[in-house]
Amino acid sequence: MSPWPPARPVPLCVLRPGREPRVEHGHDPALFVEIGSLTKVLTGTALVRMAAAGLLDVDDPVERWLPAAPACGITLRHLMDHTSGLPRLPPGIGGASRDPYAPFTDEALTGMLPRLDRLAAHPPGRHTAYSNFGYAVLGAALVAAAGRAYGELLRAHVLEPLGVAGEVTVAPPAGRSLRARGRFGRTLAGWTMDGAVLPAGGLWATPRALASVVSGLLVERRLGEPATAWQRADRLLWHNGATRHASAFAGARTDSGDWVLVHRLGGRPEDTDRLGAALLTENRSPAEEAPPYGDR
């Protein structure tokens, strides 16, 4: 007999319109969870909303707001659309570290800005290549343009208009967070995501608030046309996200208005993607299946 206890079942939360929440193994739609790269759709929406308010233009060059960056043709739109040419991760980040983003502070990002032209793998606008680094740069530019912290500008331009300002946050309220647990029931340590990487993947939210974000942005279009931070596959708009021990998938159909929010604590992020895509493409053609990014 193995001395190890069996693996814990994966907590799951699925929210869909007109259906009772599917909540398994201790998940809770009212508690705060890590949302990973779903943060990006909120950052992209903030860019579009700030442009509509006249605070900036989506085609502003990066150096307009971050003067330390060289004039290399990268615009805020390129950063939002993953066409900037910047690498997936900031230089020196990743590898075998259990907390890869801890060294990526605001000061570290500032030190990288003068090298953006040399860090880009190709000229902006030429190829699409998913970039967490690019969204960190975008977040810094938004902060400079707004003259306020990322959490504050996001609250003003996106969260309050959607009615979810109290349930999407930079840090979870004390006693209201939900985290993955190991075989022996101990809470598992997550990544440090409150530095420069915050606009790329560091937010916390309740699943019920994320459901309101999905329906509000993609179905009701309460803030106008969805930002191109969302990914598109035929008639699907979607995005996913993952941290060390959490994963999420959110999406909606542009033809029927159906939407889904899936969040899991532990397990493989790919399984979260498959479940979310399957729920959105029930009785639909195979061509409509969302092709999730491997990077989050």
State what each model feature region is.
Residues M1-I35, V58, G95-R98, F249-T254, ...:
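A short, well-structured edge-of-sheet supersecondary motif
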Residues R8-P11, R16-P17, C72-F249:
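Short, surface-exposed loop or secondary-structure junction motifs
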Residues E34-V58, L138-V143, L210:
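Active-site SXXK
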Residues D57-C72:
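Short, glycine/proline-biased beta-turn/loop segments that scaffold the active-site neighborhood
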Residues L142, L217, T254, V262-G266:
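Short beta-strand segments enriched in hydrophobic/aromatic residues
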Residues H245-A246, V260, G267-D273:
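Short, surface-exposed beta-strand/loop "edge" segments at domain boundaries and coil↔beta transitions
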Residues R268-R296:
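Short, gly/Ser/Thr-rich active-site loops of penicillin-recognizing serine hydrolases
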